[in-house]
Amino acid sequence: MASTLIVDQLQKTGGSTTALPLPTSNASADEFLKNDGAGALSWASAGGGLLGLVVYTSSGTYTVGATTNGTAGNQGSADVSKVIIECQAAGGAGASRGGTGSAYQGGSGGGGAYSKTFRDLTDITSITIVVPTGPAGGSPGAAGGAASLTKASGSGTFATITCDGGSAGGSPSGTTQGASGAGAAVPTTGDINIGGGIGPAGGEGQGARSGFSFMGVGQAFPNGVTTGPAPVGYGSGGICGPTSAPGTGGAGGAGIILIWEYK
């Protein structure tokens, strides 16, 4: 036969006695009984931990506590209170060669900047996410766009996070090779900040690679190709156009933002 134990206090045995009054209300899901050190008991939430990852490969809005976040629209946890943010900007595109029959190459694009940052989301409601696409190669190529996170709503403090994109490779003239694309400057808004790698100037041969980024690898082109290969990873620069026609410069790597959620 089942029995029921009904108490309003717990008292330890042996030595002096300390009353441990139980809370009058029931616990919520996942709560535990906590002692404040003076004998008072209360229900408390379990300790923190990693809840999951929210991925943005395009611009959008991150709503704190929503489960419809991310580019996929199905990511996020209702229990989030803190985040670690990885922000990668786009790389600059490579420039095309100098025209039909030209032996002059464009420069390769520079890599985009990266940062990693811890943030508390207390009283933050939503954050505007900007993720740049990969710029196309051409004459000249286009510069890589910046990636950023800015508070959209809420009374809490959230300083803007910004990483700049890499510069495009320069176009060749009729007598000179294209200039190298500068890597993005080291950011100043993250806890860990890494700038982009420089892209080589035109004419540095098949061993030349476009500018590296923290999340992307610099690209090269094999013998016989006519267009700069696609970027590898995120934020790397585009490779210069090969000397074989049409000699189009490679695209820069797109940006990405990762939000690691914690309780």
Report residues per predicted region:
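Disulfide-bonded cysteine-rich modules in secreted/extracellular proteins
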Residues: 10, 50-58
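Glycine-rich strand-loop-strand elements at beta-sheet edges
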Residues: 55-77, 84-152, 238-259
